[in-house]
Curated annotation (Swiss-Prot):
This is 5'-C-glycyluridine monooxygenase-decarboxylase. The gene is cap15. Requires pyridoxal phosphate as an oxygenase cofactor. Changing residue 265 to A: Loss of activity. One of its GO terms (molecular function) is L-seryl-tRNA(Sec) selenium transferase activity. Activity is dependent on phosphate.
Amino acid sequence: MNELEFHPHADRRTGSHTMEYQHLGVVPVVSAQANSTPLGGCTLSDGVIRAMGDAARFHVDMEQLWQAAGSFLAEATGSEDACPVTGAAAGMAIAVAACVAGTDGLRVQRLPDPGDQPNEIVLQKGHSISYGGAPLAQMIALGGGRAVEVGAVNETPRSHVASAVTRRTAALVYVTSRTHAVHRKGVPLDELVAIGREHGVPVIVDAAGEGGLRRWVASGADLVIYSGPKMLGAPTSGFICGRGDLVAACRAQYSGIARPMKVGKENLLGLLQAVREYTAVPEEQRAAEQLERMTKLAARLDKIPGLSARTAQDDSGRTIYRVLLTVDPAAAGRSAATLAEEMRAGIPSIYLRDFKLHLGQLEVDPRALSPDGEESVVRRLEELLLDHGGAPTGMEDAR
């Protein structure tokens, strides 16, 4: 098979990306599970790539660039200031460090030893997630904090959070993700913000994969953390935005624990261009285009034996539309879990969203999926399942 046929993002002129992966012995991937750090984040637009290339050709005063980028991101999010970082996990460590050490140079350089500073970080047990295997509590510890989990995974009364706030509390943490964090019967963000205000304790929000760049700052959170690749289409990067004094404290950590977490000029200009492109498209337009695209794909996949396909909105209510695949084990000759393994085993390795395996379901997420990637998904599913009856679904089905 020609590498240009199976790699959805190869350069059509040279195939250089695929060839480089092959030279390294690395199998190309089609990500139908969204922009995922283990799968290389996101693919970049031509505009983002150009911005990174331009940055690579010149020297710059990085202090000035960080400040200017912070002002740009603050305007985009409606916050007082912003601090670029290498990603959401780094953002959590830096945000905690800012709440523990502030801008005091000696305290900054002593971290992760907090000394006599308040360093307890209160979070609901259902929000104690991991960043690709690295526990959130570990990121808190990197910033000099100590995670204090309250409640149970499936229920956290407001009184438990309020009672956990003491003179040793440095911040409250809230994770927005409905895929990774448990929100059922938990304390909603508005109530957490109220608790923080009552006790004079800042609230840190991990909004890594969220769109709506102004929503979380407007919620009253003091610091909000975003990932660059997850929703924005940026290279490996992220940023913290929010209250001016706390963002200044985040920036102060560049001389401490954040030294290995700073964004270089190339990724930083790529991030800014990605934000420009993301905010240029109205959310309603993006959702409508996504729904139309997934509706056409669902119609094709629904004709494959053993599969029932329909469009489904993100369970959290976000305007993200996917194809929901329900696998009939008898008709398909395998379970949803086995089908997911077989999709990953080929070339290219195709990753479907598998958070609903316990229901016998898989999902196709469009956010990281190119048109060529869609064809790879359809082709592989046909190859695996047509032995159990039915006929191939041609391109005409998508028209």
